Amino acid sequence: MTNIRKTHPLMKIVNSSFIDLPAPSNISSWWNFGSLLGICLIIQILTGLFLAMHYTSDTMTAFSSVTHICRDVNYGWLIRYLHANGASMFFICLFLHVGRGLYYGSYMFMETWNIGVLLLFAVMATAFMGYVLPWGQMSFWGATVITNLLSAIPYIGTDLVEWIWGGFSVDKATLTRFFAFHFILPFIIAALAGVHLLFLHETGSNNPSGLSSDSDKIPFHPYYTIKDILGILILILALSSLVLFSPDLLGDPDNYIPANPLNTPPHIKPEWYFLFAYAILRSIPNKLGGVLALVFSILVLALMPFLHTSKQRSMMFRPISQCLFWVLVADLLTLTWIGGQPVEHPFVIIGQLASILYFSLILILMPLASLMENNLLKW
């Protein structure tokens, strides 16, 4: 008798995706982040659902409802901090997942990569809107500053901003619609993640060497299921430690002050995972130029397959490209630091130099290094 997992219409899909899936025998722990992102998404949807049961999306009661969740709801503090810090873990996994893709040339799977870029935008949009919901000072002013950037769009900008606000300022209508979008987007992200996997399984996984692994495949279960479970346990340990020992480590103290449109905080800044993009935005004195640089700082990822000039896929055997890759990582860390600093000397010039270096590395230096490596190998 044939096994039910190979005959049942639903089980067949699960079987071909997670059990009998042929996987390269040499994929390292850098390939764990896909499953970790899936777990992060599940954690966020579940904790978010329980938070939504007690949250009210009204300007008068939003802040109080979050306080009520933390003080009066059974384990409400745990759910709230799991959700807030779960977002940080989500972005850590995202950045490492994208970094892995850049290093090992995974972007050569065009469809999978482009869906991934779309997913990155969707997660960033969701996180931004979620940050507005507690209706603290940083929530309100963050929403005001970031939505205001759309007014830089020629001709339609002002109308567009007022349309998004649902009025002439960030107010009740804005909060209600942000809550609605924040609730629906994770389900869209889950659907996109399904498409992401669908395209990945069309080609099979890449591997550290960047060479074809068709001649050496192993079943996903038990080898990579066990490996994924280890990764998940480490993720849960890290998240639990953060939530139970220092839940406010990555948050902003200003968000414990209720939103006040009449009082601007001294330093308006987003959550840590947006600081690199915020630094790029601030480093250009022109409003429209800054907005374009901000969007392009993420959108440039979609150009990666076209900027690939090397004859090898992975950076595993390309020392010059490796050096530039790690310079890019250091540059992004510098931008993240600058994004959290006030707009004054010397931070302004450091931010501008780091922004120039960011785009130079991706658009010019790395493709040139690849060409140079091709010549060194005399191919």
UniProtKB/Swiss-Prot annotation:
<dbReference type="InterPro" id="IPR027387">
    <property type="entry name" value="Cytb/b6-like_sf"/>
</dbReference>
<keyword id="KW-0249">Electron transport</keyword>
<dbReference type="InterPro" id="IPR048260">
    <property type="entry name" value="Cytochrome_b_C_euk/bac"/>
</dbReference>
<comment type="function">
    <text>Component of the ubiquinol-cytochrome c reductase complex (complex III or cytochrome b-c1 complex) that is part of the mitochondrial respiratory chain. The b-c1 complex mediates electron transfer from ubiquinol to cytochrome c. Contributes to the generation of a proton gradient across the mitochondrial membrane that is then used for ATP synthesis.</text>
</comment>
<dbReference type="GO" id="GO:0008121">
    <property type="term" value="F:ubiquinol-cytochrome-c reductase activity"/>
</dbReference>
<dbReference type="InterPro" id="IPR036150">
    <property type="entry name" value="Cyt_b/b6_C_sf"/>
</dbReference>
<dbReference type="GO" id="GO:0006122">
    <property type="term" value="P:mitochondrial electron transport, ubiquinol to cytochrome c"/>
</dbReference>
<keyword id="KW-0812">Transmembrane</keyword>
<feature type="transmembrane region" description="Helical">
    <location>
        <begin position="320"/>
        <end position="340"/>
    </location>
</feature>
<keyword id="KW-0472">Membrane</keyword>
<feature type="transmembrane region" description="Helical">
    <location>
        <begin position="226"/>
        <end position="246"/>
    </location>
</feature>
<feature type="transmembrane region" description="Helical">
    <location>
        <begin position="178"/>
        <end position="198"/>
    </location>
</feature>
<dbReference type="InterPro" id="IPR048259">
    <property type="entry name" value="Cytochrome_b_N_euk/bac"/>
</dbReference>
<dbReference type="InterPro" id="IPR005797">
    <property type="entry name" value="Cyt_b/b6_N"/>
</dbReference>
<feature type="binding site">
    <location>
        <position position="201"/>
    </location>
    <ligand>
        <name>a ubiquinone</name>
    </ligand>
</feature>
<feature type="transmembrane region" description="Helical">
    <location>
        <begin position="33"/>
        <end position="53"/>
    </location>
</feature>
<dbReference type="GO" id="GO:0005743">
    <property type="term" value="C:mitochondrial inner membrane"/>
</dbReference>
<keyword id="KW-0999">Mitochondrion inner membrane</keyword>
<keyword id="KW-0349">Heme</keyword>
<feature type="transmembrane region" description="Helical">
    <location>
        <begin position="113"/>
        <end position="133"/>
    </location>
</feature>
<keyword id="KW-0679">Respiratory chain</keyword>
<dbReference type="GO" id="GO:0045275">
    <property type="term" value="C:respiratory chain complex III"/>
</dbReference>
<keyword id="KW-0813">Transport</keyword>
<feature type="transmembrane region" description="Helical">
    <location>
        <begin position="347"/>
        <end position="367"/>
    </location>
</feature>
<protein>
    <recommendedName>
        <fullName>Cytochrome b</fullName>
    </recommendedName>
</protein>
<feature type="transmembrane region" description="Helical">
    <location>
        <begin position="288"/>
        <end position="308"/>
    </location>
</feature>
<keyword id="KW-0408">Iron</keyword>
<dbReference type="InterPro" id="IPR016174">
    <property type="entry name" value="Di-haem_cyt_TM"/>
</dbReference>
<keyword id="KW-0830">Ubiquinone</keyword>
<dbReference type="GO" id="GO:0046872">
    <property type="term" value="F:metal ion binding"/>
</dbReference>
<dbReference type="Pfam" id="PF00033">
    <property type="entry name" value="Cytochrome_B"/>
</dbReference>
<feature type="binding site" description="axial binding residue">
    <location>
        <position position="182"/>
    </location>
    <ligand>
        <name>heme b b562</name>
    </ligand>
</feature>
<feature type="binding site" description="axial binding residue">
    <location>
        <position position="83"/>
    </location>
    <ligand>
        <name>heme b b562</name>
    </ligand>
</feature>
<keyword id="KW-0496">Mitochondrion</keyword>
<keyword id="KW-1133">Transmembrane helix</keyword>
<dbReference type="InterPro" id="IPR030689">
    <property type="entry name" value="Cytochrome_b"/>
</dbReference>
<keyword id="KW-0479">Metal-binding</keyword>
<comment type="subunit">
    <text>The cytochrome bc1 complex contains 11 subunits: 3 respiratory subunits (MT-CYB, CYC1 and UQCRFS1), 2 core proteins (UQCRC1 and UQCRC2) and 6 low-molecular weight proteins (UQCRH/QCR6, UQCRB/QCR7, UQCRQ/QCR8, UQCR10/QCR9, UQCR11/QCR10 and a cleavage product of UQCRFS1). This cytochrome bc1 complex then forms a dimer.</text>
</comment>
<dbReference type="Pfam" id="PF00032">
    <property type="entry name" value="Cytochrom_B_C"/>
</dbReference>
<feature type="transmembrane region" description="Helical">
    <location>
        <begin position="77"/>
        <end position="98"/>
    </location>
</feature>
<feature type="binding site" description="axial binding residue">
    <location>
        <position position="196"/>
    </location>
    <ligand>
        <name>heme b b566</name>
    </ligand>
</feature>
<comment type="similarity">
    <text>Belongs to the cytochrome b family.</text>
</comment>
